[in-house]
Amino acid sequence: MLKRTPLYDVYKEYGGKTIDFGGWELPVQFSSIKEEHEAVRTKAGLFDVSHMGEVEVSGKDALSFLQKMMTNDVADLKPGNALYTAMCYPDGGTVDDLLIYQKSESCYLLVINASNIEKDIAWLTEHTEGDVTLTNQSDGISLLAVQGPNAQSVLAKLTECDLSSLKPFTFIDKADVAGRQVLLSRTGYTGEDGFELYCRNEDAVHLFKEILAAGEHEGLVPCGLGARDTLRFEAKLALYGQELTKDITPIEAGIGFAVKHKKDSDFFGKSVLREQKEKGAPRKLVGLEMIEKGIPRHGYAVKKDGVPIGEVTTGTQSPTLKKNIGLALIKTEFSEVGTEVEVEIRKKTVKAKIVRTPFYKRPKQS
């Protein structure tokens, strides 16, 4: 039996087509992936991401515990701020990538990938020591994401909060939006400006409909997982299970900015990650652009002069660039921009070249 979010019945109202996504019945699209992608890049989109996991970590030893478990420097946080981090195994492989919100002096909210909830909680529990309490809140919290250049003007119609003063990776813990209390953060997974709203399950449908109504004249549309994937891919935002796995380190995956190997605390994977940061990693995540016809897909082999050098982690026809592009994890010595390589597509060898990433960067606000 597939799991469903509190918004399941609403999908049908708006024409949502659902798929099995890691055991969840979620909308892959409402209108079309291309239209939804375009709406988020130019106007706004609304996503149901309630399948994500939420774990509260509290207690006087919460900070020292998180410093031991996470690659980023959690001591940099203060209440009302969030950061992106990885959690690693001793060999540097990735347990998960996640967001940490500091709610108060000794209380943090971890937002983890849906497919990793049980694994992450088991890993955290195994290493808990001192005054630390872990509370799995995943089943009681729904999560909506409003993303795109018009996201702020849409939400401004529903709240008295001063959204313009909310900087990226900051949040308001008990914000009133459309008459409901939410944790409202300026975060997202699309490469655009945007907000995420963590709410009680019973408030999810009300908020979803209120946001859609508020965005009616702003070009906001409901969006599915298909557009979420093409948007994050163009912005080179890693997806666990593709760019990050237990066999791929955060350095290899290009998120070295979330690894603070000089922080005082020891953490899982520190020695391996420090060495990769200082001396370079054996593999590197690069951008591919096809020279010949063909779309690079997850798992396709990448070769240089017929010799395997890595594989594609994500690939598609980019809705924004109108090109066939991919991300690939390859041997570092072949990662220079401009290098020609081959991708094996349906037993045929197809030419591609290494290009700069991210493929898409949000235009600066004038």
Curated annotation (Swiss-Prot):
The coding gene here is: gcvT
Entry's Gene Ontology BP terms: glycine decarboxylation via glycine cleavage system
GO MF, any single term = transaminase activity
The record, for InterPro entries, names: GCS_T, GCS_T_bac, GCST_C, GCV_T_N, GcvT/YgfZ/DmdA, GcvT/YgfZ_C, TrmE/GcvT_dom1
Q: Which organism is it from?
A: Bacillus velezensis (strain DSM 23117 / BGSC 10A6 / LMG 26770 / FZB42)
- A GO CC term assigned to this protein in UniProt: glycine cleavage complex
Highest taxon of the lineage: Bacteria
- What Enzyme Commission number does this protein have? 2.1.2.10
Protein name from the UniProt record: Aminomethyltransferase
Which keywords does this chain's UniProt record carry? Aminotransferase, Transferase
Q: What Gene3D superfamilies has UniProt attached to this entry?
A: Aminomethyltransferase beta-barrel domains, Aminomethyltransferase fragment, Probable tRNA modification gtpase trme, domain 1
The taxonomic lineage of its organism, from the top, reads: Bacteria, Bacillati, Bacillota, Bacilli, Bacillales
What catalytic activity does the UniProt entry give for this protein? Answer: N(6)-[(R)-S(8)-aminomethyldihydrolipoyl]-L-lysyl-[protein] + (6S)-5,6,7,8-tetrahydrofolate = N(6)-[(R)-dihydrolipoyl]-L-lysyl-[protein] + (6R)-5,10-methylene-5,6,7,8-tetrahydrofolate + NH4(+)
The answer on whether this UniProt entry bears the keyword Transferase reads yes
Quaternary structure, per UniProt, is: The glycine cleavage system is composed of four proteins: P, T, L and H.
Transferase keyword on record: yes
User: Could you tell me what this protein does?
Assistant: The glycine cleavage system catalyzes the degradation of glycine.
Q: Which family does it belong to?
A: Belongs to the GcvT family.
